[in-house]
């Protein structure tokens, strides 16, 4: 079957897509026409995903591992270890570039410098975050669950509810309020999904941990439905009168995210 091989490739494409959309603000393609930019981004993320698959990852067989696919890479990292590392990057993408709208990096005036800094931060920082979480005893499954649920919490706050109730002029207080609310929602969802997922969950060799179900529920059900609810149904009935329209690909404060070349 296509699982888990296609899952690894999809994750390797998904994270660069978010990077170009939320983190870099479509740079370096922001000056192209919408169609040209879309094609360029599509080709770029697929090229990056395939490069990861073939040159960074491997499917070395071993006890408890699935058989290698007919077409496998020859990199140094075992393929099923890679998605959890990517999800460390996802946490930073969601918190800093969706929830906090690019803060504090939108204070960097030079667009080229900002492009380099945000990429180094999310890629290098994401790998360091994964290492730190592993160092404190979290499994890759738990890291995946945490990333999926943080994503769900941020999407609920920023896309479904448009940041409400933290929409006042005091940006520092707004950021603090959003971070606190995201932490509360994350903790509540993690506990709830773990309790639900553990009911009669099979505990046999070869069965994926319940945390992978939690990650999938957070990403594919909760976050995806919140995005559809905002984009298709206009947040009804949750939309606050006078709230902005559902955010586009880069939900950012224009005053803080306009590229300024130095």
Task: Name each region found by the language model.
Residues 1-10, 29-35, 54-87, 105-112, ...:
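Membrane-helix interface and helix-disruption motif detector
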Residues 12, 71-77, 84, 88-100, ...:
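Intrinsically disordered, low-complexity regions
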Residues 14-38, 62-67, 92-116, 154-177, ...:
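Cytoplasmic membrane-interface regions of multi-pass membrane proteins
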Residues 16-18, 42, 55, 78, ...:
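Acidic, low-complexity intrinsically disordered regions
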Residues 40-56, 83-94, 114-131, 149-154, ...:
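Alpha-helical transmembrane segments of multi-pass integral membrane proteins
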Residues 94, 146-262:
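C-terminal transmembrane-bundle signature of multipass membrane proteins
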């Amino acid at each position: 079957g296509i699982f888990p091989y296609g899952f690894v490739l999809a994750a390797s494409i998904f994270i660069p897509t978010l990077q170009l959309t939320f983190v870099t603000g479509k740079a370096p393609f922001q000056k192209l026409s919408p169609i040209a930019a879309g094609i360029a981004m599509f080709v770029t993320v697929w090229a990056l995903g395939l490069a990861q698959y073939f040159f960074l990852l491997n499917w070395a067989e071993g006890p408890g591992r699935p058989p290698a696919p007919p077409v496998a890479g020859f990199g140094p990292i075992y393929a099923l270890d890679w998605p959890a590392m990517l999800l460390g990057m996802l946490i930073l993408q969601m918190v800093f570039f969706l929830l906090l709208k690019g803060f504090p990096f939108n204070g960097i005036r030079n667009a080229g410098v900002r492009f380099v800094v945000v990429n180094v931060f999310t890629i290098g920082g994401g790998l360091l975050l994964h290492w730190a979480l592993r160092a404190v005893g979290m499994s890759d499954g738990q890291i995946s669950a945490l990333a999926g649920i943080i994503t769900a919490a941020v999407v609920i706050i920023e896309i479904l509810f448009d940041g409400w109730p933290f929409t006042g002029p005091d940006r520092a207080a707004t950021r603090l309020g959003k971070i606190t609310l995201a932490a509360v929602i994350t903790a509540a969802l993690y506990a709830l999904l773990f309790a639900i997922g553990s009911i009669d969950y099979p505990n046999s060799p070869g069965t994926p941990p319940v945390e992978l179900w939690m990650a999938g529920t957070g990403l594919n059900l909760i976050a995806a439905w919140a995005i559809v609810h905002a984009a298709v149904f206009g947040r009804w009935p949750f939309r606050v009168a006078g709230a902005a329209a559902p955010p586009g690909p880069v939900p950012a404060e224009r005053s803080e995210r306009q590229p300024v070349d130095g």
